[in-house]
């Protein structure tokens, strides 16, 4: 896991190295203070060979040098170190999020059907951000603390070996304590992160569906459901907090014993004349430079457990396999005719579930309008979703212009199929930007032209800022009919040879339906058009009507032929016209 993460770090290794070098200088400067104290006591105050004026002169020079180092030299070093560390870590997170976003766009509809959007967002935002601590702490601060400890110990050994050995007495207990607590903390951190993601997933769903909550007046019930998720997170968080508190209390106790031992031994040596008072004072100063980093290392280990848990979750997402892959030798094939042939297609969402489609065979000619009808759950929309490869067939094959759709590059295939759905998604951007999704390189004139053809231009011009009006999240500021017209406009802009209308007008009032049906009639002209519809009155003009029941095609023909047949279609039509 760490090795994989380091692949993102590798392009910035020289900056990290520079950050560590600058950090060594930054942390090395405070180590002069204990030596300054020793010099002031032993070299000046207790130096009876110097006169008072000489003592003041020597002390003034020493303090002047110290002030120059701490006031003039250290601040820019501190700035450079902080800037380098933050720039590098944020750039690495930028690369990770970029990779994750591209990965998410490549994942199939099956992944999104099986995972809460809120949890996915939590991994991309929260978990990636949490891994920043691995860069700042694991790759920078830990090394700086270790180097600080080594430098401090070297100076302490130089000052007095016995006192240094006394300081090292607690090290074995320190290492044992860290070892005991670290593994447990990592497990608890992973559990806490998962619980937080569940809270975020629940919250995301309920906020998106707040109209349902309010319409059924189930606020109290949903508050209880949220409280269950929130309470589970609280339980996990408190377990983590309790264990974290145990570790800090134990390790701080161990590191507090060290200075007490050193002061006791040092005082005895000073009384006996083995060391000077200045040496003892310097040693006490170095104790904080020794045990301070040791305490920070414990905090670093705690931080790293959280970072590793988040790293696990990030790579779980990165390792999510693609259901829909470009086949070997896939090409950006141009669809020239738009003929579709479906041979012996079977489909099931999961291996342990019953088939949704069973031995589907169908041919659709160039420019033909074909409608798919039947009871809900029969498999109409599922069949439609197989053509742009939102899902792959379980068995059988689908051909377009004689080419297996798996021979197309996925992006090339989908770019040549226009899809208008019942609830089209608009992004929280301007009207113009939402239309440009059809072809981002289109000109303003082309945007206006397709809006006119889609019967959208007039209502757009009545909006506060016209084409520059923000539509809100999912187009919340627009009516259903207005959103549908914008979605049709972007299909016009893309101008695909194949068009799929999946319940495109079923949720609209009669006036909106009439306006949109007019636009759809223009849109479907000279294109192979597939329509999924519940309102049979909207598809009587179709060249072919396909009736699907329980995953089987049970009837095929024109409206007149099927009415005359008095079968499944005639039964559905009669029910709707009672």
From Swiss-Prot:
Domain ABC transmembrane type-1 positions: 16-306
UniProt keyword annotations, A-Z: ATP-binding, Cell membrane, Membrane, Nucleotide-binding, Translocase, Transmembrane, Transmembrane helix, Transport
Ranges in the topological domain labelled Extracellular: 37-59, 160-162, 263-267
Subcellular location field: Cell membrane
The keyword Nucleotide-binding is annotated on this UniProt entry: yes
Enzyme category, top tier: translocase
Membrane topology listed for this record: Multi-pass membrane protein
The enzyme's E.C. designation: 7.6.2.-
GO molecular function, one term: ATP binding
Ranges of the Cytoplasmic topological domain: 1-15, 81-138, 184-242, 288-578
GO cellular component term of the entry, any: plasma membrane
PANTHER family: ATP-BINDING CASSETTE SUB-FAMILY B MEMBER 10, MITOCHONDRIAL (PTHR43394:SF1), ATP-DEPENDENT PERMEASE MDL1, MITOCHONDRIAL (PTHR43394)
Function: May be involved in multidrug export. Transmembrane domains (TMD) form a pore in the cell membrane and the ATP-binding domain (NBD) is responsible for energy generation.
Name of the protein: Putative multidrug export ATP-binding/permease protein SAB1799c
């Amino acid at each position: 896991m760490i090795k994989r993460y380091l692949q993102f770090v590798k392009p910035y290794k020289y900056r990290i190295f520079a950050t560590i070098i600058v950090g060594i200088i930054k942390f090395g400067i405070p180590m002069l203070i204990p030596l300054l104290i020793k010099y002031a006591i032993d070299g000046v105050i207790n130096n009876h060979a110097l006169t008072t004026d000489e003592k003041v002169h020597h002390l003034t020079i020493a303090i002047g040098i110290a002030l120059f180092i701490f006031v003039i030299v250290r601040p820019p070093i501190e700035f450079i170190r902080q800037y380098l560390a933050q720039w590098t870590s944020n750039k690495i997170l930028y690369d990770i999020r970029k990779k994750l976003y591209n990965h998410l766009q490549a994942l199939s509809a099956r992944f999104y059907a099986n995972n809460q959007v809120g949890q996915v967002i939590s991994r991309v935002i929260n978990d990636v951000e949490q891994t920043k601590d691995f860069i700042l702490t694991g790759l920078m601060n830990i090394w700086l603390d270790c180097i600080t400890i080594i430098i401090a110990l070297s100076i302490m050994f130089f000052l007095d070996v016995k006192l240094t050995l006394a300081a090292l007495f607690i090290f074995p207990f320190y290492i044992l304590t860290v070892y005991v607590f670290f593994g447990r903390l990592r497990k608890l951190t992973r559990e806490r992160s998962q619980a937080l993601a569940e809270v975020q997933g629940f919250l995301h769903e309920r906020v998106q569906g707040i109209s349902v909550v309010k319409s059924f007046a189930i606020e109290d019930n949903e508050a209880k459901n949220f409280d269950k998720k929130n309470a589970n997170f609280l339980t996990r968080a408190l377990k983590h907090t309790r264990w974290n508190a145990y570790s800090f209390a134990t390790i701080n106790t161990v590191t507090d014993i060290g200075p007490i031992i050193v002061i006791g031994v040092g005082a005895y040596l000073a009384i006996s004349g083995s060391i000077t008072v200045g040496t003892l004072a310097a040693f006490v100063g170095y104790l904080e430079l020794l045990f301070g980093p040791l305490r920070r290392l414990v905090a670093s280990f705690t931080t790293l457990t959280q970072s590793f848990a988040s790293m696990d979750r990030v790579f779980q997402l990165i390792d999510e396999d693609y259901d829909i892959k470009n086949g070997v030798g896939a090409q950006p094939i141009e669809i020239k005719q738009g003929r579709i042939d479906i041979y012996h297609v079977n489909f099931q969402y999961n291996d342990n579930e019953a088939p949704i489609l069973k031995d589907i065979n169908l041919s659709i000619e160039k420019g033909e309008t074909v409608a798919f009808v039947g009871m809900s759950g029969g498999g109409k929309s599922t069949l439609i979703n197989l053509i742009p490869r939102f899902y792959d067939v379980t068995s059988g094959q689908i051909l377009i212009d004689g080419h297996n759709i798996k021979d197309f590059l996925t992006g090339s295939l989908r770019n040549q199929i226009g899809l208008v759905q019942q609830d089209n998604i608009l992004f929280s951007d301007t009207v113009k930007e939402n239309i440009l999704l059809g072809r981002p390189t289109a000109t303003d004139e082309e945007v206006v032209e397709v809006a006119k053809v889609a019967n959208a231009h007039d209502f757009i011009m009545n909006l506060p800022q016209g084409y520059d009006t923000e539509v809100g999240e999912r187009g919340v500021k627009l009516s259903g009919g207005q959103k549908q017209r914008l979605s049709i406009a972007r299909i016009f802009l893309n101008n695909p040879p194949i068009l799929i209308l999946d319940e495109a007008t079923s949720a609209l009032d009669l006036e909106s339906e009439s306006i949109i049906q007019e636009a759809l009639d223009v849109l479907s002209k000279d294109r192979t058009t597939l329509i999924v519809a519940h309102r049979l009155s909207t598809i009587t003009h179709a060249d072919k009507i396909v009736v699907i029941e329980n995953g089987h095609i049970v009837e095929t023909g024109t409206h007149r032929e099927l009415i005359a047949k008095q079968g499944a279609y005639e039964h559905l039509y009669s029910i709707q016209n009672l």
